[in-house]
């Protein structure tokens, strides 16, 4: 959703950008309120399988499934990277400050080389036994620590748009 209340009356070229098959530019005459809906083909579809499980060592284990979102072969590059993002705020993404670098888990292309699209992938959050290896750090994720944590999984291919490789995400 995009809402900009500071655009002046005039003719504008609109190009939606994201981790999806690109759409052509649309020329729009803006005068007053304009509502536009765009339907896109994501590069990947990423979905949770079941619920996160809190393990005895204080980590969370999750399962996800990644599938292609488009049949267009020009946008079916191999998986390049995936993350299980963990955050203490409900807006979880790959943006700076929107995830914990200590608790999130990164899967590189090498980690994903044996993964087949459509299969279930099991991932754990980082730092078993809490930060510092379970030395009593109060940031440990366990049932006695009441601060909420939010999880989100994102995966991306090697395809870049405007020099940016973009993630497709699960919900939070």
PLM region spans:
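Solvent-exposed serine/threonine-rich low-complexity stretches and specific carbohydrate-binding patches
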Residues: 1, 95-126, 170
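Beta-strand-rich modules
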Residues: 7, 13, 119, 123-163, ...
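Structured interaction patches on ligand/partner-binding surfaces of diverse proteins
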Residues: 5, 13-43
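Structural beta-strand segments of beta-rich domains
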Residues: 58-62
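Beta-sandwich strand segments
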Residues: 20-27, 74-76, 160-169
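Solvent-exposed loop/turn segments flanking beta-strands in beta-repeat/beta-sandwich domains
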Residues: 69-104
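Solvent-exposed, conformationally flexible loop/turn segments
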Residues: 30-35, 41-43, 57, 110-118, ...
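Proline-enriched interdomain boundary motifs that mark the N-terminal boundary
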Residues: 44-51
